[in-house]
Amino acid sequence: MRSSTQPHSLGRDADAAPEGRSGLTTFLTRGRVARWVTLAVALIIWFVPPPEALGVQAWRLFAIFAATILAVVIGAFPILTASVLGLASAILTGVLPTKVAYSSFANPTIVLIIVAFLLARSVVKCGLGQRLGFRAISLFGRSTLGLSYAIYVVDAVIAPAFPSNTARSGVLYPLVLSMAEAAGVSPEREDRKRLAAFLMFSGMASLTLSSALWLTAMAANPLGTEIARTYGLDIQFGSWLVAASVPTILCMVVMPYVHFKLVRPEVSAMPNAPAEARASLARLGGLTRDQKIVGATFVGLVVLWGAAASLGVDATAVAFLGLGILLATGVLTLGDIAKEGDVLATYIWFAALFVMSDQLNALGFMEFLGNRLAMRLGGLPPAAAAVTLLVVYVAIHYLFVSQTAHLLALFAVFLGVGVKLGVSAPLLAFQLLFATNYFASLAPQSSSANLLFVGSGYLAQGDLYKWGAIHTVACILIYLLIGTPWLLLVAR
């Protein structure tokens, strides 16, 4: 069993090379083949004459972008390496002008994500996340199902402060592990394995829904809203929360029960868990100075982010203000910032992929692809088209190891096709954005946020594929049947 509380690096491969000589050899061999495949695909697309409706620049940028995404999907390179090579290739071949290529590094949305990563460090450092976890267990933990709801509540509360579900998994995982151990779970106990699996899968699944609830709870969310602006949609913190509230909260109520029936843990009653949590809280004592500062800062951030549109306040500036307060009060130090090395990696690959995706749209490639897909779906009524696009968008995620890469590659295409077929742009945009979050549990590799839970030793790979598929299908049904009328009412 792993007990690490640190999330996996965003700049590394999702699948770590196995230890030992044979594992390393296998990894290098697989990587070498994948790199040749990636290069071959890039060259084939590059030298094939572009379709009549497309210019050479758009076609060659597509060759580079497709190869970049393929490299990540098949494990040729980590996402950082692939993105850097892709951007450099686009610039050096003259496909992207220098000023355009570097413009995304000053994009306010991307800067907001990076600052929010640094803000999230304070929640972990001061222990506020752990305290919230114990409080939720003391309130909800009298049964196994109650523990699952406690996980969902804690995750939903801390989610808006974490722009990375991967980083948030580093806070949530040790809490789930503590719950499991308090319930008598250990690798040696065969009579508690399904209980451990239930709690671990609850942690994985909760991350998918808390990320859908809040705009700032997953790094791809604000990127998606930025892309949606090209269709005249202005999605802010408050409007996202209103749109997500009804279907997402309903999922949070329903899914723990679905998981309980699906996994069938050996133990259903947990009478000692609340007492254990209260004892842990008592040992922690009162709120520390740093916890009070962090709590007050994040309350202020959430309020200002929620009112940013009406007050005319820049959301990125609000994030910088919060970071400044935490640095000025000593809650965070320059040493803490220096430890967040993955933030720089995230900044670079976000910006690189974003500008390539954005320029594909600007050069007409997304419109061209949308027209082709629309021809395939031609004749479908808007309702059927919306459902088809959503289901296909979700199913394709089996091929991706990054939610953000999936969104950057396909969100604009599917939204454009839907609009051409008469689907409401706000409706489809929100449905696709929410799906980008809840499809993260489709497979073990579907999100880097899964890795700590998958590595716990309590989740079998076969079970994960089955449970993940059922969770995702159930979410699709709820978001379609309940979310659609709600979005038609509130989304603009």
Briefly describe each language-model feature range.
Residues 23, 50, 67, 80-189, ...:
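Membrane-embedded alpha-helical segments and adjacent helix-loop junctions characteristic
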